[in-house]
């Protein structure tokens, strides 16, 4: 039997079930097995590994994962795809499909039920564009014990995850992801290898979880508040952004100027020029003056 991710087999499956693509669910099926293999290769899935997939579609990536992993768990929100997955994944007894929205699911419960304690597990997925960021944040903030993520996403979002200070792509998303993970852009994927064809190109991004965050901060929540406030209006200075947008901090520009100067950061700089280390230093200094 041909792999699912060939143009003809995908077309046959879609026609057999009369499946219509829902734009609202970001359904674009990959029809290139070479790209799928690059994804699985970079996940470094071994015979004892587990994989979590989000949005398996008709099972193209799931199939490649099932050939290599000990266990694959796939979250699929669209009930119409369940009978299709029953057929396409029938040869693989190591796959469990869960008909739930991963954003609402108790992922820790699923993890403990489906995987062995201490098992090497990766999140491997062709993520729906419209929920890429919420999914990554949910799985990172809930501290799911996975080794990392190899995910396909909109190229523009991938560029933001990997961005360095001083670039137009660099922002609060870059800092949040790099705080938890090491980011690597594996490859750009042209829009032509999807059905239906999206309007943008994609990228495969690998995120390997750090043993501990890249910087030490006194208060994680406050650190991210400082970061978000610093990027509230990109063209404004740190001084203006922090004095107008940092909740729980005195509206005192003189105090803010003094703190910024003390930690060696020019108040006239913009947030996009600060490294993650500078943001950590700044938030650790600012929190000493936070209103209780």
Curated annotation (Swiss-Prot):
The keyword S-adenosyl-L-methionine applies. GO terms for cellular component: cytosol. GO terms for molecular function: 16S rRNA (adenine(1518)-N(6)/adenine(1519)-N(6))-dimethyltransferase activity; RNA binding. S-adenosyl-L-methionine binds at residues 28, 30, 55, 76, 101, 126. Its main location: cytoplasm. Disulfide bonds: none annotated. It is found in: Cytoplasm. CDD domains: AdoMet_MTases. It catalyses: adenosine(1518)/adenosine(1519) in 16S rRNA + 4 S-adenosyl-L-methionine = N(6)-dimethyladenosine(1518)/N(6)-dimethyladenosine(1519) in 16S rRNA + 4 S-adenosyl-L-homocysteine + 4 H(+). Keywords: Cytoplasm, Methyltransferase, RNA-binding, rRNA processing, S-adenosyl-L-methionine, Transferase. InterPro entries: KsgA/Erm (IPR001737), rRNA_Ade_diMease-like_C (IPR023165), rRNA_Ade_Mease_Trfase_CS (IPR020596), rRNA_Ade_methylase_Trfase_N (IPR020598), rRNA_adenine_dimethylase (IPR011530), SAM-dependent_MTases_sf (IPR029063). Its EC number is 2.1.1.182. Pfam families: RrnaAD. Specifically dimethylates two adjacent adenosines (A1518 and A1519) in the loop of a conserved hairpin near the 3'-end of 16S rRNA in the 30S particle. May play a critical role in biogenesis of 30S subunits. Belongs to the class I-like SAM-binding methyltransferase superfamily. rRNA adenine N(6)-methyltransferase family. RsmA subfamily. This is Ribosomal RNA small subunit methyltransferase A. It comes from Bacillus mycoides (strain KBAB4). The gene is rsmA.
């Amino acid at each position: 039997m041909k792999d699912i991710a060939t143009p003809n087999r995908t077309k046959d499956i879609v026609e057999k079930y009369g499946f219509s693509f829902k734009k609202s669910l970001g359904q674009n099926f990959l029809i290139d097995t070479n790209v799928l293999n690059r994804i699985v290769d970079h996940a470094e899935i071994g015979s004892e590994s587990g994989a979590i997939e989000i949005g398996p579609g008709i099972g193209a990536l799931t199939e490649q994962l099932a050939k290599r992993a000990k266990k694959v768990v796939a979250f699929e929100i669209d009930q119409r795809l369940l009978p299709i997955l029953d057929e396409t994944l029938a040869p693989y007894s190591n796959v469990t499909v869960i008909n739930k929205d991963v954003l609402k699911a108790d992922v820790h419960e699923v993890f403990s039920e489906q995987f062995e304690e201490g098992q090497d597990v990766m999140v491997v997925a062709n993520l729906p564009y419209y929920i890429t960021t919420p999914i990554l944040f949910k799985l990172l903030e809930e501290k799911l014990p996975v080794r990392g993520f190899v995910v396909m996403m909109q190229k523009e979002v991938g560029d933001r995850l990997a961005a360095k200070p001083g670039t137009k792509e660099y922002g609060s998303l870059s800092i949040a992801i790099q705080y938890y993970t090491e980011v690597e852009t594996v490859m750009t994927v042209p829009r032509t290898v999807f059905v239906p064809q999206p309007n943008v190109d994609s990228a495969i991004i690998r995120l390997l979880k750090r043993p501990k965050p890249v910087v030490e901060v006194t208060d994680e929540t406050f650190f991210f508040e400082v970061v978000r406030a610093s990027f509230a209006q990109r063209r404004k200075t740190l001084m203006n952004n922090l004095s107008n947008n940092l909740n729980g901090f005195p509206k005192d520009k003189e105090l803010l100027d003094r703190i910024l100067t003390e930690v060696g950061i020019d108040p006239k700089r913009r947030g996009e020029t600060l490294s993650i280390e500078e943001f950590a230093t700044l938030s650790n200094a600012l929190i000493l003056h936070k209103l209780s």
